[in-house]
Amino acid sequence: MSVFEGRAWISNQGLVDVSIEVEKGYISSVKKTNFNPNREKVDGLILPAAMDMHVHFRDPGYTHKEDWKTGSESAACGGVTAVVDMPNTNPFTSDYSQFKEKERIAKQKSVVDFGIGINVEENLTEQDWFETVPAAFWKLYPYGISSKDYFRLAQEVLGKTKKPLVVHCEHPDYMHNNPLEKLSDHTENRLIAEEKCLSEMPPSKYLHVAHLSTSNGLRNLPSQSSTEVCPHHLLLNLDNCRSLDCKVDPPLRTISDNKTLYDAYRKGTIPILASDHAPHTVEEKRSSAPPSGMPGVETMVPLMLQEVVEKRLDLSRLVNSMAEAPADRLGLSRGRIEKGQPADFMFVNLNKSCLLYTSDAADEELR
């Protein structure tokens, strides 16, 4: 048995002086304490570790960018002990055998807990494994599909699923996949695509809108649905990050969008924080036609902890959005420091800071 004493974040109580007992990887006891002078006390705060329900670890198929080992190591370095990987690897994770192969690779390489999303394709709900495959969720992309089929598939899966349907909500009719388009055109095209998509998406408690990025998108969220926001859509914008290195999907938006989304995030209207970690090689991002995406799983928690230090964000909101809310959305018993939960927590000293140098980063793209 291991014992940790310190000031910990306990759900519905806040910061409490506690003694945490851990056995076989799970919390066996959490007790209020006056601290044992003969036992070392944790220097700083004990917070629930984060769960990132939106990562792209590039394995299989694109391991020159990243694999499950480096991706999960960067997650652990950033205080993230559970991730859900998106299906747009090579091959796409679209059927049971592809799911099992990715699961095999992840079990072999990952140093954190993981879930896997499955891509929505034609006739998915008719497959004999549809109701039994242990996927974290279904994922619907707008690429290479007509708008009619996109919304039909969404309706079909939502009508039969008991798992979340995560949608990359950009309307197929309004997307332009020209890799040479300048950043301003890329942003405008994707702005129209997101808002049009959201206005046509059917309401459902199983619907989850990935990486919300605009004020109008927030206003057009389908009823009963949940959503997430990424640090780069809260902190970066077209004024402070204008180079093609900053090309992501959905794109960076305006300062006004930053402020509106941040306010909704503070209030809990946007319940979940996710990174949309999507690394590429340095050479790819520095090319004349860089692919969309940037790393984030290693920096998501530190960036938002800095927001707490600067008093722009309450610690309670951060803990809920990075640990409790994503676990609850996926129906998982984790994300809290309480008896019976996985012993996944991190030690944080808000009085210390450091610079992240690319040579220190676990993530391959940051090096």
Please describe what each predicted stretch is.
Residues 1-35:
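N-terminal metal-binding scaffold of metallo-dependent hydrolase/deaminase domains
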Residues 63-66, 70, 94-97, 149-152, ...:
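Conserved active-site and cofactor/substrate-binding residues in soluble primary-metabolism enzymes
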Residues 357-367:
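Single conserved hydrophobic/aromatic residue that forms the stacking wall/gate
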Residues 73-172:
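Divalent-metal coordination cores built from histidine and acidic residues
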